[in-house]
Amino acid sequence: MLGKDMKMEEQNAEYVQEFLDNEIVRLGELIEEYKANVKVMGEDFNMDNPNGGMYSGMELTQIHHEMEKQFIYSEEAARDAYFYKKLRKAPYFARVDFKSDRATREKTIYIGLRTLQKHDTFEMLVCDWRAPIASLFYEDFPDKAFFKAPSGEIRGDLLLKRQYKFENGKLKYYVDSDLKIDDDILRDVLSSSSSEHLKVIVNSIQREQNKVIRYSDNENLLVIGPAGSGKTSVGFHRLAYLLYQNRTELSSAEIIMFSNNDIFSSYVADIIPELGEMPINYSSFYNIFKAEIPTISTGDYYSLAESIINGDSRRSKSAGIKLSKDFVAYLESDTDVCEPEFQDITLFGNVIFSKEALLERFLSDTENSQKSRGARLAAYTQGVIDEYFINNREEIYLHIDADSEIDEDTAKLFKAKRRQIKESAAEMIKSAILVDPIAVYFKLLEKYAEENNCPELLDTMATLEKGYLEFEDAIGVVYVKSVLGMAAVLSGVKHILIDEAQDLSYIQHKLILRMFPRARVTLLADTNQAIISELNTTSKEELAEIYNANILNLNKSYRSTKEINSYALKLLPEEKRYEIFERTGEDVKEISGNIEDFKNVVKEMAENSPSTCIITRNLKETIEVFNELKTEIDGLRICDNKSFELSHNPIVMPLALTKGLEFDNVIVYDKDGAFSGDENKKYLYMAATRALHRLTIFNCKSELKSEN
């Protein structure tokens, strides 16, 4: 859309592009200068250099530190240059004209991914989307506009809200909007193809999403939203916003994102750097297992999900108990099932403190962890030893040197003996309380199973003999280790983002709180997408209670076309349905046929768009489909929870691994009604909402066989 101001807008775009070009050149020269400096200093630092011996050790240390600084400056300049090159494609995406009630003239603010400011004149060319004044673009104001600045609320008149479309650095058009981000531009954004990585959405953030992003960093936040509502993107944009707002208090290294799906972690890994920040940390509970119980192999969340999806009701019941709130309380209340084996503290054949008395005192102290109780017992024991030495001084002197009078040397030996007894007692107590958390966990499990008549809880004990722990047992072991005070406490982590929070069990959430006691938490959840709802904390009220979190709702889905969204909504109970953004596309296809028909459908869809995913109910079916199609479909890949990177090649995946991902085209492989029936509607809903543009449900009657 061309307007009367198009010439002026083109001139402004060229002005900003010129600034970027100059900055890229300047940064390139700086990088070369830093490299040259490092080279010169490196020659001086080389001791083989004839002049190397001229420097003292302190001077060489200073040279080394200066070289490190030059390396850091060079890396920072390189990052800035890289980012400026990206900004050349679209230096900004919006403009607002605002007249504050305090000002006499209006102010024009261009908004982009990053602040662009001239070094000499301090002229602000582009304002960072995270700046307080930029919030004017994302909000709707029926009356006076306002934004929250550090100095307080600034009120005034919003005179213009304008959006821009750039293509390869050239301004194509702009659109003026009175109230909200223009739907045509939003449709344009949503109509684009899927990507191997989560996309930056700063140019299309909606009002309710903006509220989540800019929410207070002093409180825990639970974000509830349907599939396609932008929860994950909003969560990461919130992290970028918090980093921008708290430069001196929060760094990327102090943030961690938790997910049950390692493939999803790779999908989102680039978004924080794309938003101009250093990468954050990513983890899963499987990584925690490797750190806390490294001597034993463990299952992951996906292996448990596969068992439940495949109908293993016995394991479902067992895991449901092990991951529950009641079992957590049981683990916390009785970790003394493996009593410490204390030894008598003796001196010259006399018992100072008996092992029975040590155990009795230890068991009578029920506050805090076993490690803390052991420390208190050790401190108490030191006092008992001191008192014994004072009360039995003469007898001890006789044992030390019966033939000599008490002199200075004897007194020194007396003190040395007391120190020796105290040190050995402290070491004995420390060793005694270092119980095996695996042994403690399984003793507790046996006790609980007997008390509650749940023999199925012990089914997984057989795997321990093979050096393997199932996921639900590994979580329990690490939790017991934490209760005992033996697990890591990562106080340096200040913020945690938990994606698909509804897929984490009660015990997982509680373990996060124990291991990261200083961290604020942002949780992203959709209770309609609990992959194994029998095991998980699916109530948003319960999630909020665990973290003492406030709840914000995202009520509209943007990902899929109107046709796909309408199909998915019919799979949900009426009370759980949500708003959709209307973007029209192709009708959803429901096809029945044999294996040859299935091959033809996949071929046709993959030829039209490589971003095609065939979603199966489980891993067994994934392998069957892949083996049947691998010679028919060019570049077909299989995702089976091993090392995997997403690409634009067609792919076959089991349902559990598709959580959080999106594809242009989705074919749901409904083998013999695997996704049919009321009990399977939630699985079909999860699969259907992975599709952006085209969705096909294929009911295949032919029997496929997996190859080993």
Per-range role (PLM):
Residues 243-497, 503-511, 519, 528, ...:
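Alpha-helical nucleic-acid-binding subdomain
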Residues 2-34, 188-304, 686-689, 708:
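P-loop NTPase Walker
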Residues 248, 262, 266, 270, ...:
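Conserved helicase motor core of SF1/SF2 NTP-dependent helicases
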Residues 235, 470, 680:
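Short, conserved glycine- and acidic-residue-centered signature motifs
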Residues 205, 497-498:
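Short hydrophobic beta-strand that contains or immediately precedes a catalytic carboxylate
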Residues 95-97, 163, 222, 234, ...:
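A structural signal for short, well-ordered beta-strand segments and their strand-loop junctions
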Residues 1-202, 206, 210-214, 708:
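Extended, charged low-complexity regulatory segments
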